[in-house]
Amino acid sequence: MNIGIVNDLPLAVEALRRTIALRPEHRVLWVATDGAQALDFCVAQPPDLVLMDLVMPRIDGVSATRSIMERSPCAILIVTANVGANASYVYEAMGAGALDAVDTPTLEQGGSADPSQPLLAKIDQIGRLLATRMPLAAPAAAAPAPQGALPPLVAIGASAGGPTALTALLRRLPDDFPAALVIVQHVDQAFAIGMAQWLDGYSPLPVRIARQGSVPQAGEVLLAATNDHLHLTSRGVLAYTRRPEETPYRPSVDVFFHSVVDHWKGEAIGVLLTGMGRDGALGLKAMRTKGHYTIAQDEATSAVYGMPKAAAAIGAASAVLPLERIADQLISLVQRNRQRWR
C-alpha cells in the first residue's frame, strides 16, 4: 500500500517509517507535518492509507480527517502517542471517518514485545478490508423461528463515521423507547468500553457493552465489545465467537445480522449506517428476505458511503434514509411492531 504519514514529531515519523519498512509491500508516499498539508497531499497524491496523528499545529487530526473524507476520501488510521488518554478525540475522528486507532510505535528495541506489531496488525487488517471485493459468505439460514413475547430488536451496524452517526441516532430516541437495540460498530476491543460510556453520554437510553450471555432488553442499548463476532444463539442470548476466522473486520455486522435472522423469535429492524466496505449488506438482505424492515443510511449523510451503498445496490434496504430521519422511522415502526413490515 501507498501510505501517507501525518505527524509533526520527527521521532514519531522515523518510528513510523521503520515500521512500514518492515513490510516490502508498503511504502511511504509522503509525510505531512500538519492537517492542512495532509489535505493538500491527499488531493494531489491520493494514498491507500493515511496514518494520522491527533495533536498537531494549524489543523488537528480530527479536523483533518473530516476534511479529507469530504474532499479526497481514503482509509485513515489514527496513530497517536497515547490513544487511551485521547479517547474522546479518537471517537470524534472515527465519527469523521477514521477506521481505527493505535498507539505510535517507539524506537526502543528493549523488552520482549515488538513495538511495531500493533501498528502492523492494524495496517494488515485495513489492507484486507481494502482488498475485499466480494461479499462475505453467508452462514446457512435456519428455519424461521416462531414469534414469541419479545421486544422488537433494532440491530445496527456501523463502521467508519459510525460514532457520530450513532450519537445522532440515539439522541433522537425517547427514553421510553420500547425496543432493544444492539450495535455492532467496527472498533477494537480496547476502545469498546470507552465508546459505550461515550455514547451513553449522548443517549436517553442506557448504553452498555454486550457481555457473554446478555439478553437484549427493551429500552437498553448493547454494544459489541470484543474482537470476536457478536451473535445471537439459538436460546436468543448474545455470545461471542471467533468464527468465521477470515473476515476483513471483527466484529462482523454480517455475522450478527444473520444470527438475528436465524435465532431472534420476535420482530426485528435492521439498520446499516456509514462505513467502508461491504460488511452488513448480505446480512441486511437476509433480514429483509425474512420479512424484517431494513434501513440503509443515504449517501449525503454518510461519512463513508460503502456499507450502506452495497446494501442498497443488492436491494437489501426497505428504505434508504438520511441520518436525521432514521430515529423517527424507528419510532414509527416500533409503534406498529406487530404489523408485517415489508
From Swiss-Prot:
<dbReference type="GO" id="GO:0000156">
    <property type="term" value="F:phosphorelay response regulator activity"/>
</dbReference>
<keyword id="KW-0963">Cytoplasm</keyword>
<dbReference type="GO" id="GO:0006935">
    <property type="term" value="P:chemotaxis"/>
</dbReference>
<feature type="active site">
    <location>
        <position position="279"/>
    </location>
</feature>
<keyword id="KW-0145">Chemotaxis</keyword>
<keyword id="KW-0597">Phosphoprotein</keyword>
<feature type="domain" description="CheB-type methylesterase">
    <location>
        <begin position="144"/>
        <end position="337"/>
    </location>
</feature>
<dbReference type="InterPro" id="IPR000673">
    <property type="entry name" value="Sig_transdc_resp-reg_Me-estase"/>
</dbReference>
<dbReference type="InterPro" id="IPR008248">
    <property type="entry name" value="CheB-like"/>
</dbReference>
<dbReference type="InterPro" id="IPR035909">
    <property type="entry name" value="CheB_C"/>
</dbReference>
<dbReference type="GO" id="GO:0050568">
    <property type="term" value="F:protein-glutamine glutaminase activity"/>
</dbReference>
<feature type="active site">
    <location>
        <position position="159"/>
    </location>
</feature>
<comment type="similarity">
    <text>Belongs to the CheB family.</text>
</comment>
<keyword id="KW-0378">Hydrolase</keyword>
<dbReference type="GO" id="GO:0008984">
    <property type="term" value="F:protein-glutamate methylesterase activity"/>
</dbReference>
<feature type="modified residue" description="4-aspartylphosphate">
    <location>
        <position position="53"/>
    </location>
</feature>
<comment type="function">
    <text>Involved in chemotaxis. Part of a chemotaxis signal transduction system that modulates chemotaxis in response to various stimuli. Catalyzes the demethylation of specific methylglutamate residues introduced into the chemoreceptors (methyl-accepting chemotaxis proteins or MCP) by CheR. Also mediates the irreversible deamidation of specific glutamine residues to glutamic acid.</text>
</comment>
<feature type="active site">
    <location>
        <position position="186"/>
    </location>
</feature>
<protein>
    <recommendedName>
        <fullName>Protein-glutamate methylesterase/protein-glutamine glutaminase 2</fullName>
        <ecNumber>3.1.1.61</ecNumber>
        <ecNumber>3.5.1.44</ecNumber>
    </recommendedName>
</protein>
<dbReference type="Pfam" id="PF01339">
    <property type="entry name" value="CheB_methylest"/>
</dbReference>
<feature type="domain" description="Response regulatory">
    <location>
        <begin position="2"/>
        <end position="119"/>
    </location>
</feature>
<dbReference type="Pfam" id="PF00072">
    <property type="entry name" value="Response_reg"/>
</dbReference>
<dbReference type="InterPro" id="IPR001789">
    <property type="entry name" value="Sig_transdc_resp-reg_receiver"/>
</dbReference>
<dbReference type="GO" id="GO:0005737">
    <property type="term" value="C:cytoplasm"/>
</dbReference>
<dbReference type="InterPro" id="IPR011006">
    <property type="entry name" value="CheY-like_superfamily"/>
</dbReference>
